From Swiss-Prot:
Residues 529-551, 571-585 have a biased composition (Polar residues). It is found in: Nucleus, Nucleolus. Residues 395-407 have a biased composition (Basic and acidic residues). Gene3D superfamilies: 1.20.120.1190, P-loop containing nucleotide triphosphate hydrolases. This is Nucleolar GTP-binding protein 1. The keyword Nucleus applies.
Length: 655
């Protein structure tokens, strides 16, 4: 558990009346509220058992939350444990939390007993009375917490105002008689705005400030003044300082007022220093002679000086003189205290077993000389020259001028034009200022700057030729190894077309396959190209006029459109001619015929299967219409969801 506690997060503890109102209102809101005597008895029992169980569970959760959030004195740091004992009385605090735990156990027993009784309720009235008795006994049990809840709320309010003190951090602890300048020093070294008044016990509790030293944060704790009397006679204000002195591993700053304006003599202050001396065991102590602007250590008598120095030497403490009015010695006191505490903490770590275990594993490797040859550090000649000039008093050479220096020597920016060619290293220095044209004799000068440009060009051309040869070789591999004559190609095309026509004629002769318009069009195209006599007019039931009329159209006709055209053409014929044609016309193909492999015994079985498939597909077809074109309006307010106890705000339903 962390040593820094945040008591501000403890939830507010309600009073007894508020507690009961919270529990019962939650039970009313979260459980059903309507029951009728006509319901089955098991439903009525369940209704009231739910009420009792929910109330018992709610009280248990609330009381458990209180017990969990309040700290246990045995589990927290001893400093906070003793501080809470001083402020709130450990026994009273434990009794209050114990009462909360006892009432929680009592409520659980009441709920368990009445749930058992409700299982045997034989009517709505009896179940209701059992529920009423259960809630009443729970409320009566919670009434015993009236004083405990009030006390815990006061403790919570006071705990939320306690300072956040880390018992293990670097700490400077200020102590001494009242009105000796402790709070003034606190305000000087930290930003804590502690009240300072010219009377005693202005500071009535612990105040914490923070300061920085060597890039680390330090706690500075201002304690209330302590009077020189027995421990039993000290009040709560003084006991807070005693608790801090006893438990915090800090550097103790004991302030003394040699001018005795605090109302206590030097002897009394020395007596207090000796009486609380056992609390300084194992801690660095610094005695601060404050208010040096009024009285210094040299201004007091020799007897007082010897008395003070004897007490300091017995304790093994250090001493320093300061003045918070003139800031004399304030910074030195802060530095001395921090350095002393750091040294003390280092000594404690060195004496620990962990430090010894780590120290035994450390090894410091020191290089040894391999021969007698001296190998001094290398110093550049320029640096050695500067050292010699400095030793002899000669002026050191000036540094090399840069272009910026020349710029400011010649008028500043905009007036000086730097010469970028003066650092060029050419074969002939006279070539530096030569004017180089961009184009000469129709050639770009920069194309011939490279002396190897001709060789590079030849290499590039050779690479391009090799690449072209590779591409030609790949293309030659993709070409066919032989080529056909045009007449041979035409003969091959004629043979392929003839094979297609033969396949179409065979398909038309087969009665199981229907002849399509696309096949007839393909035959006509073949007749036009080859001069063959394969014509649709030879087909029974189709006249040459129909063929001619369809040939004039740009689009192919479907079977239905062909039938219409035949009807129109036949309307111009006489009745006898029509009868003659109809008597010799071909028979109509069956629309539903059983083909091999379909698995039907006859046409009737196939018709029955088609009808059943339509029936099965009907629900899916009904759902398929849902979309932008769907105009069906479903029931938007189903009665089973909107009947019952529904308030206007819409937050309650029938349950």
């Amino acid at each position: 558990m962390s040593t820094i506690y945040n008591f501000k997060t403890v939830t507010v503890v309600p009073s007894y009346k508020d507690f009961i109102d919270i529990v019962l209102s939650k039970t009313q809101r979260k459980t059903p509220t309507v029951v009728h005597k006509g319901y089955h008895i098991s439903r009525i029992r369940q209704f009231y058992m739910r009420k009792v169980k929910f109330t018992q569970k709610t009280i248990n959760e609330k009381l458990t939350h209180i017990l969990t959030e309040f700290p246990r004195m045995d589990d927290i740091h001893p400093f906070y444990g003793d501080l809470m004992h001083v402020l709130y009385d450990r026994d009273h605090y434990k009794v209050a939390l114990g009462q909360v735990g006892a009432v929680r156990h009592m409520v659980d027993n009441v709920g368990r007993d009445y749930v058992r009784l409700l299982k045997y309720g034989d009517s709505l009235y009896r179940c209701k009375q059992l529920k009423r008795a259960a809630l009443g006994r729970m409320a009566t049990a919670c009434k015993k917490l009236t004083s405990a809840l009030v006390y815990l709320e006061k403790v919570r309010q006071h705990m939320s105002r306690l300072p956040s003190i880390d018992p293990n951090a670097r700490t400077l602890l200020i102590t001494g008689f009242p009105n000796v300048g402790k709070s003034s020093f606190m305000n000087k070294v930290t930003r804590a705005d502690v009240e300072v008044q010219p009377y005693a016990f202005t500071t009535k509790s612990l105040f914490v400030g923070h300061t920085d030293f060597k890039y680390a944060s330090w706690q500075v704790i201002d304690t209330p003044g302590i009077l020189d009397h027995s421990l039993e006679e000290r009040n709560v204000i003084e006991m807070q300082a005693i608790t801090a002195l006893a438990h915090l591993r800090a550097c103790i700053l004991f302030f003394m007022d040699l001018s005795t304006q605090c109302g206590h003599s030097i002897a009394q202050q020395v007596s207090l220093f000796k009486s609380i001396g056992p609390l300084f065991t194992g801690k660095p102590v610094i005695v601060v002679f404050n208010k040096s602007d009024l009285c210094t250590f040299d201004d007091i008598t020799a007897e007082e000086q010897s008395l003070v120095m004897t007490a300091i030497e017995e304790c093994g403490a250090k001493w320093i003189t300061t003045s918070t009015l003139t800031d004399a010695g304030v910074g030195d006191l802060k530095t001395l205290a921090c350095e002393t505490l750091l040294a003390h903490r280092s000594e404690q770590k060195e004496g620990s077993g962990r430090f010894q275990a780590i120290q035994n594993r450390l090894y410091c490797a020191v290089p040894q000389k391999r021969d007698n040859v001296e190998r001094p550090a290398y110093v550049p000649p320029s640096v050695e020259e500067i050292r010699q000039r400095l030793a002899s008093g000669e002026p050191v050479r000036e540094r090399r001028k840069t272009e910026r220096d020349y710029e400011w020597e010649n008028g500043g920016p905009g007036q000086y034009q730097p010469n970028e060619r003066k650092t060029w290293d050419l074969e002939n220095p006279e070539w530096v200022d030569d004017i180089i044209p961009d184009i000469m004799d129709g050639h770009n000068i920069y194309d011939n700057v490279d002396p190897d440009i001709h060789e590079r060009l030849m290499e590039l051309e050779a690479e391009e030729d090799a690449r072209l040869q590779e591409l030609e070789l790949e293309a030659s591999k993709k070409r066919p190894q032989y080529e056909l004559h045009d007449s041979t190609v035409e003969a091959v095309r004629f043979i392929r077309d003839k094979i297609k026509v033969i396949k179409m004629e065979r398909a038309m002769k087969n009665p199981s396959l229907r002849r399509t318009r696309r096949q007839s069009v393909a035959i006509e195209k073949f007749n036009k190209r080859t001069g063959s006599q394969v014509d649709r007019s030879a087909t029974p039931g189709c006249s040459s006029e129909t063929t001619n009329s369809s040939a004039k159209r740009g689009r192919s006709l479907s079977a239905a459109q062909e039938a219409v055209m035949r009807d129109r053409s036949s309307s111009h014929m006489s009745t006898k001619t029509t009868r003659g044609i109809s008597s010799h016309s071909a028979t109509r193909d069956r629309s539903l015929s059983v083909n091999r492999g379909e698995g039907y015994r006859d046409v009737n079985e196939k018709l029955r299967a088609v009808k059943l498939s339509k029936v099965v597909a009907r629900p899916r077809n009904l759902q398929a219409k849902k979309g932008e074109g769907d105009r069906a309006i479903p029931n938007l307010r189903p009665k089973h969801l909107f009947t019952g106890k529904v308030k206007s705000n819409g937050r309650r339903d029938r349950r």
